[in-house]
């Protein structure tokens, strides 16, 4: 590399500073120069001298005539940054970059006595000649106005990242005033159940999940969580006990990221079986503007449970060879010694058009009802793909949910699970300060022969059984229902549901107990602050569903998803009585639960004859058209008792530490491979992100 004897011959130099009322940057050589014009000249000439000293090009460029366009800045610390260089030869570009990198630090520009960055453009031509003989002037072929405009645009571009940083602000619990859904957890909903059901409140409580904004007028999560805060100083303590793992918040956006777990260790003493669950969870919740919110979670799990629960999972094995469906979670493959590996993903995007209309699209859960169970739509299944539209006006809230459910018992020709579609409608009406009445309808049709989503079912009006007949008698099935809630006092309300599956008036009132008399009934009562003990709550509930309800003569057109009932987790053909007590104090909580059930099961695995208990049987094989009673088939009695005590470790992430004790006694008239006498005592210790209800009361 030969040192190029640089002589300066500058045909054009244009400097344009980025803002008015600014001084020029000052080299050490210019410290004693007075007035702005002289400082400008000193800065320009000194810069050119220092560039000349640092530009070392190979001998090949001695005779090169090369125009070079430069844009650079001096930041608020006085450091030169070359933003743009245009030249034909790559070596010239590289040398200019190196030269600017090696320029000394200067005093930055001053704007109103504050250091600020300034930006310049410059055009040079090689070979360069003696700088002292050069008279600085603007290029004639490139007007100064154009260069100034270019510089200002680049200044704006360079400021984009700083603008994002300037818009950022500390996270301040934006989630608690957003339209993010509150996780469907009985422990979480119990915190505000009394407040949202006071006489005179207008919340439509049968349609769940609620959003934080829905609940805020009655229960302020942000305020209540601050009461529980430990206010630790260390990062680890704050993230473990009080805060989300990571949060980002700005002028029109926010999101919170958490890493959760569901770790359980236990023992089924009645069957001499160690149990465990190992779930790792990554989940994000956020909002863009005031109207768009979202949630997404990934669960990666392995587990082994009490013997009765493992057997139930295996009895629901899909048709494609997987060994099990874990109730409440989904299809599982084998893991380790009689364990399961069952990944789950869930999430949604929610858009709030205005105070009257809301749209949500997701793969998640919904619940309709005021009870512990629902005979309309429950949250005991795996997440279901859906589109949900809510309309709220006057004293009414109207919900339309369009779902795509999977039949894991049946495969298409391509080997995929067959699908069916469900159009569900629920109208909630606050009749007065105390009484709420709801109307329900669900239409189900299968996707055989690639029928797809029948747009006839997009009709948002209730009670359109006529659609079924207009598309053919084999089109699908329709269920209708009625629910109510009555607030007796601020501390007591009763509730109920009546479900009618494929209403046939003659058979319902015929008196011969026809198999077409398919209905379900729920009655319940909640008592808050029982016996004047704050946060002590009681609940009593009775449920019954007659045989053949939720099933259909086409097996794929039942009311189920991934082998699980979309309504009551027992499916059909049962009576059930439930008593629940709950108590909470600060971060501590506890509940006790007792459930008694009279149930009927299919004597044979192939559901022939069909007694109406298995949703996947067909009405073509019914045991009898008349004389149908609850408990028919293989009659069973079951009791289920549960005690759980826990501590809310982190309210923001819903992370809890708990101990759970279950005693289950199940006796059946006829022992077989699927149903047999079994007594279980299952003790479990867990550390869990409480993001969904997980039911074990089978």
Model-flagged regions — what are they?
Residues 342, 435-443, 448-698:
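Exposed, low-structure sequence patches enriched in small/polar residues
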Residues 72, 84-87, 122, 126-128, ...:
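A mature extracytoplasmic/lumenal domain signature
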Residues 5, 19-155:
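Charge-biased low-complexity segments
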Residues 4-15:
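Sec-dependent N-terminal signal peptides
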Residues 160-436, 443, 447, 512-516, ...:
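Outer-membrane beta-barrel channel domains
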Residues 103-105, 259-265, 660-664:
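Generic short beta-strand segments
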Residues 5, 64-66, 116-118, 276, ...:
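Residue-level preference for beta-strand/loop junctions
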